Regions:
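Flexible "arm" and connector segments at domain edges
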Residues: 1-27, 33-157, 161-224
Length: 224
């Protein structure tokens, strides 16, 4: 059932990114069905029930939202998140950045690691420092490439990606959504090239890069 649950979760994410309410409703229902499946399986095995799940959720929400259910103060969403992460760390005795699923997509995991660290004050003070760090990492990547040190280049590329995710977080840009939009744009532009080649009864192998680039430039005006 787990692979199907992962599939349903991704289908929900895609529906959310497309902004299609009817799809979102349907996919939320599918995910909810899986929640009930697991709860039912737990009940049949005498381990837990849906009531246990809901009760634990209630306890966690109350414990980690003292600004709502207690006397604590939180002025904005950032303060709420910081409070949440501190309480999680205190209650679980885990690392502040612990608790993230091992199978979480790397881009999302990078974002959440940085978000958790920032919640306890370990963060860049300004965008300027972050952009300077990006320049530094790009220079290190360039040196590794020029030296033909592929393993070092791989490590430096990872550093660049990590900084880019952090930059997106500071700008309030979801890197997953940003990359998703760029992927969609590339797909549309590339499919335009395929369409033009089909109309001309030609293949990619029969075209030089200059001709393909001309089609690409045309596609950019259609799909900016």
């Amino acid at each position: 059932l787990v692979p199907l649950t992962i599939e349903e979760a991704y289908e929900l994410i895609e529906a959310i990114l497309r902004g299609e309410d009817a799809e979102i409703v349907e996919e939320l229902g599918d995910v909810l069905l899986h929640v009930f499946f697991y709860a039912r399986m737990g009940e049949e095995e005498g381990r837990f029930s849906i009531d246990t799940v809901v009760e634990r959720l209630n306890q966690k929400l109350i414990a980690r939202h003292p600004h709502v259910y207690g006397q604590a103060q939180a002025s904005d969403a950032k303060a709420v998140l910081a409070q949440w992460e501190k309480l999680k760390a205190a209650q679980s005795e885990r690392s502040v950045i612990g608790g993230l699923p091992e199978r979480l997509p790397p881009l999302l995991k990078a974002y959440r690691l940085q978000e958790k660290a920032a919640a306890v004050g370990f963060d860049w003070a300004s965008l300027q420092g972050l952009t300077e760090k990006l320049k530094e990492e790009l220079a290190e990547l360039q040196r590794a490439i020029e030296a033909n040190q592929l393993s070092e280049a791989a490590a430096e590329l990872g550093d660049v990606l990590f900084v880019l995710v952090n930059l997106g977080r500071h700008l309030g840009i979801d890197p997953e959504r940003a990359l998703h939009q760029t992927n969609q744009k590339f797909e549309k532009r590339f499919q335009y090239i395929e369409k033009r080649l089909k109309e001309a009864q030609k293949t990619f192998a029969e075209c030089d890069l200059e001709e393909l680039d001309a089609y690409w430039q045309q596609s950019k005006s259609l799909y900016p």
